[in-house]
Regions:
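A polyanion-binding, active-site-adjacent surface
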Residues: 1-155
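Conserved RNase H-like, two-metal-ion catalytic cores of nucleic-acid enzymes
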Residues: 5, 9-21, 25-29, 156-288, ...
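Acidic beta-strand-to-loop metal/phosphate-binding motif
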Residues: 83-89, 241-249, 529
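Alpha-helix capping/helix-boundary segments
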Residues: 91-93, 251-252, 412
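Conserved "right-hand" nucleotidyltransferase catalytic core of DNA-directed polymerases
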Residues: 149-219, 238, 281, 292-293, ...
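Conserved catalytic core of nucleic-acid polymerases
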Residues: 355-362, 484-490, 571-718, 729, ...
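C-terminal polymerase-core module
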Residues: 381-388, 392, 399-452, 639-688, ...
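Short hydrophobic/aromatic beta-strand micro-patches
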Residues: 724-728
Length: 789
């Protein structure tokens, strides 16, 4: 019970009741039609106490849980007309179904028997939680719709039949059936021990085959038979007219290519990517998708439970379920894409990009293993020394010779900062931003500043050691990463990256400068790089219709190297001649040798942050300004560019009115829950950030699909607004010309268009003849522009 429920002695009063009965109203049910009770009959802890103690989920003892379980089951048995039960929240779900995790089981309808009578239990979130988190509201309504389907007689399970342990002949026959069928087919792999355990296929929504290569302890096929099956699968996945469907196909595809040398030429439909395009705010796992598009209960635990139960056949059946559910979702999503005018963008951009990201993962990037080992050894010593310096600084600052702490522990650092040294920051966070605030605070003495400086140095080196220097590479001495098309929540269209599923590699989009020498080109190759200059700010200039910015950016484009848009902004903000603005971000004092940031740097930081509703206190941190200087810069920025706030206002008004925003490229943001002020920042940033991501991503497939692109050249890295290709030096001019030509294609904004200039670099060989990421240098002349279509 909530505090308010306890006061009036009635369940679901206030906001939680409104959430629940708004959903039940669509089932033609009111309070008079339902019996309400608590799974746990007492309030374990009040909301105020829970907040004070930092308790998110109150815990009930096993003894008390068992007592309330018996009470609830007895209570239900006394309801003669009850047929359906809404189990709302983790305790209700566990008591009635025995299942843990409301996040997994929400949306499931489970048949249970209580005191000899059968019931259907519909699982969902606790309405109290939904009332506090608007993002859960759409999910809650989806789950309550299951009750509506039951009452209307529309509830229907998929009834999937899984054909497992096929003979060689049956496996080959089914692959042929799939290949020569004109219908879409789903595929899915499962892995064990870092090897492919099976490949599942389905051309029917209720029947599929798992071609499992092994049993619990033996191989199922001879070496010859398995080779023939794998070749048949390669032929199937290479068929141009085949309509292959998968959930998160990029994983299956890069795994099959790297591990099994089976290359999926082009997945026709990825349900995860389609769902991400249709409903960006929702989760996109297959478990969630199944709860949205089918009436079947949660099943994803079946992929793990077989290990405990020792029944491997359940694993193969699970594989077939994945295939059939994916096919069910694909059929429904295709209709939704067409109805919502998203199908063209989905097939012509989202799906077109995917095989190129797979290629980037499989190709990887060569590592200088000798340098990596040297850096690791040196850093291991450095980190140990830095940790000792932290102890010495803390002992001096506290005046305690025996003081000891772990600088990697936020809890122990928090005790040092706030209890022992009495430092002042914002709250009790020990993150980098708050450490900077504490360092700059007037009450922080020199000894305490030395503590912060040493902790910063230790954390920087320790992170570099664990994240970069000690990163696992593959047996072929390559770094790899998995590029995710759904990875950036607030900017769909931008790519994120992470380690690959077999455990090696790392996020290659945030590599620090001192790690870049480890990344090298293959022998006989060089790196070609381009960065889309101020792409987001240029898009903001168009969206907010800022004539002055448009003119500045165009002047910078047609006069590369001689005119700088950030200097122009600084000139306007501080009302000084353009030629008096330093062209660098930092200048060094010839007397002290200390560097300080320039007006250009501050203007650039303003443009990067203040476009998206950043407040001046945050600007103080990002631009390394005092609060007073940050407020001055904030006011100057918006005074000289009033169009920015006008753009915010019209964007928010449109979002409230239409509940959606669509970029000029065709990607959509959609508001599915009730309006929430916290969504404002992401709404403002959505169009420029998503457009930037989609534009850069499009250059990847446009280049590699161009018939002029050299056969052995490839894009190897996406670094936000930049791409890096690897090519033979003789092919460099052509590679860079194609990259520029596609990167600088005019982008249509309706009444106007814009060209975003691309700044280029090329790697230079060192004394050892090796081209490294760290040796990229600016080109003296811009690449040629070619005609593209």
């Amino acid at each position: 019970p909530t505090d308010r429920d306890c006061r009036v002695n009635q369940p679901f009063i206030g906001a939680s009741g409104q959430v629940l009965f708004d959903a039940l109203k669509k089932c033609n049910l009111s309070r008079n039609h339902v019996y309400m009770t608590y799974a746990i009959k007492r309030q374990v802890i009040s909301a105020s106490q829970a907040k004070l103690q930092g308790i998110k989920t109150p815990v009930v003892s096993k003894q008390e849980f068992d007592t309330y379980k018996n009470v609830l089951l007895t209570e239900i048995s006394y309801l003669p007309n009850c047929k359906y039960i809404l189990a709302l929240g983790s305790y209700a779900i566990k008591i009635l179904t025995g299942n843990d995790s409301v996040m997994h089981w929400r949306g499931s309808v489970i048949d249970v028997s209580i005191a000899g009578r059968d019931y259907k239990v519909i699982c969902g979130y606790n309405p109290t939680l939904v009332a506090l988190d608007p993002k859960l509201e759409i999910v809650f309504r989806m789950d309550m719709n299951k009750l509506s389907r039951i009452l209307e007689g529309k509830f229907q399970l998929a009834n999937i039949y899984a054909e497992i342990n096929p003979s060689f002949k049956d496996a080959m026959s089914y692959i042929a059936d799939v290949r020569y069928s004109s219908r879409p087919f789903a595929y899915d792999i499962e892995t064990m021990g870092n090897e492919t355990a099976c490949v599942g296929l389905a051309i029917s929504e209720n029947h599929g085959m798992c071609i499992n290569f092994r049993t619990q302890g033996t191989n199922r096929f001879s070496t010859r038979e398995e080779l023939v099956i794998r070749r048949a699968l390669q032929t199937l996945f290479s068929t141009p007219e085949g309509k292959s469907v998968a959930q998160n196909a990029n994983f299956d595809n890069y795994w099959l290519w790297y591990k099994d040398r089976i290359q999926v030429s082009q997945t026709w439909f990825d349900t995860m990517l389609a769902h991400h395009l249709l409903y960006p705010p929702l989760p996109h796992s297959l478990g969630f998708i199944v709860s949205q598009y089918t009436d079947d209960p949660y099943y994803k635990d079946e992929g793990k439970l077989w290990k405990a139960e020792g029944e491997i056949d359940d694993f193969w059946r699970y594989n077939v379920k994945d295939c059939c559910y994916t096919l069910i979702a694909q059929r429904r999503m295709l209709v939704e894409l067409e109805e919502q005018d998203l199908s063209k963008f989905f097939f012509d951009h989202v799906m077109k990009l995917q095989p190129h990201l797979t290629r980037m993962t499989v190709g990887g990037l060569l590592c200088d293993t000798q340098l990596k080992e040297t850096i690791t050894d040196e850093l291991t010593r450095t980190v140990g020394e830095a940790k000792e310096l932290c102890q010495v600084a803390a002992q001096k600052a506290t005046g305690r010779a025996d003081y000891a702490f772990n600088p990697a522990s936020p809890k122990q650092c928090g005790k040092l900062f706030f209890e022992d040294l009495k430092l002042v920051g914002r709250g009790n966070s020990t993150n980098k931003e708050n450490r900077e605030r504490m360092y700059k605070h007037s009450r922080t003495n020199s000894d305490s500043r030395a503590v912060i400086t040493n902790i910063d140095s230790y954390l920087r080196d320790a992170k570099f050691l664990s994240t970069y220097a000690s990163a696992t590479i593959d047996p072929d001495d390559r770094f790899r990463c998995e590029y995710k098309q759904t990875g950036v929540i607030n900017a769909p269209g931008r790519l994120s990256s992470s380690a690959v599923m077999w455990g090696s590699g790392l996020n290659l989009q945030n590599i620090p400068e001192r790690a870049k020498p480890m990344f090298i080109a293959d022998e006989g190759y060089e790196f070609s790089y381009f960065d889309a200059a101020q792409i987001e700010a240029r898009f903001v200039a168009m969206l907010a219709n800022i004539p002055q910015w448009k003119a500045q950016f165009e002047m910078a484009r047609v006069n590369p190297g001689s005119y700088d848009a950030h200097c122009a902004l600084a000139s306007v903000m501080w009302n000084i001649p353009y030629e008096n603005v330093p062209k660098e971000d930092f200048v060094v004092d010839p007397v002290t040798g200390l560097s300080s940031h320039t007006l250009r740097f501050t203007a650039k930081r303003c443009r990067h942050g203040l476009n998206y509703r950043m407040a001046y206190d945050r600007l103080a941190t990002t631009a390394n300004l005092s609060m007073n200087d940050a407020q001055i810069a904030y006011n100057l920025y918006h005074r000289t560019t009033p169009e920015i706030k006008d753009w915010w206002r019209t964007t928010i008004e449109r979002a409230k009115r239409d509940r959606k925003i669509t970029t000029p490229f065709g990607r959509r943001w959609i508001l599915m829950e009730r309006w929430d002020e916290d969504a404002l920042d992401s709404i403002i940033a959505f169009v420029p950030q998503s457009m930037a991501g989609d534009h850069i991503a499009s250059v990847i497939y446009k280049c590699e699909r161009d018939v002029r692109w050299p056969r052995d050249a490839r894009i190897v890295l996406n670094i936000h607004d930049a791409l890096i290709a690897i090519n033979r030096p003789a092919d460099g001019p052509l590679v860079r010309a194609l990259m520029r030509s596609y990167a600088e294609e005019p982008i249509d904004f309706g009444d106007d268009s814009i060209i975003v200039p691309a700044d280029f670099k090329v790697s230079k060989p060192g004394e050892d003849g090796i081209h490294r990421w760290s040796t990229l240098g600016k080109l003296k002349e811009r690449p040629e522009l070619l005609s593209v279509t």
